[in-house]
Amino acid sequence: MAKKITGYVKLQVPAGAANPSPPIGPALGQRGLNIMEFCKAFNAKTAQIEKGTPIPVIITAYQDRSFTFEMKQPPVSFFLKKAAGLKIGKKPASGSKTPGKGAPAGKVTEAQIREIAEKKMPDLNCDSVDAAVAMIRGSARAMGLEITG
């Protein structure tokens, strides 16, 4: 018989930097999950990924207080900022203050967008790489990035 699922927890955790402080501790504590066990497992799985890369993770909580977790690719905005050479981090915001008007925040090439689309393909809700490229182009425009060649 399969374990009974009691819920899901969605978090975005920096690679190799999971610790019991907020937001991880309270989110897992509410479900009665072992926080340190998750932190150790997550940090071990993300050891080969560049430190500080934001990793979306979906934790499945079971009735017996055990859990499993699934990691996704970093957000598109992270890849776009990296490709454009912008500062990566939450504050200060490194996108354009007024996207579509005035000076662009940075530049990305079509080749970089295609590369990002191929990396993100498993996580995106689309069937073809061309559709993924269109989604990422839209994200780049919304961030105030100029798309070249």
Swiss-Prot record:
It holds the Pfam family Ribosomal_L11_N. One of its GO terms (cellular component) is cytosolic large ribosomal subunit. It comes from the Bacteria. GO terms for molecular function: large ribosomal subunit rRNA binding; structural constituent of ribosome. Belongs to the universal ribosomal protein uL11 family. Part of the ribosomal stalk of the 50S ribosomal subunit. Interacts with L10 and the large rRNA to form the base of the stalk. L10 forms an elongated spine to which L12 dimers bind in a sequential fashion forming a multimeric L10(L12)X complex. This is Large ribosomal subunit protein uL11. It comes from Methylobacterium nodulans (strain LMG 21967 / CNCM I-2342 / ORS 2060). The lineage of its organism: Bacteria, Pseudomonadati, Pseudomonadota, Alphaproteobacteria, Hyphomicrobiales.
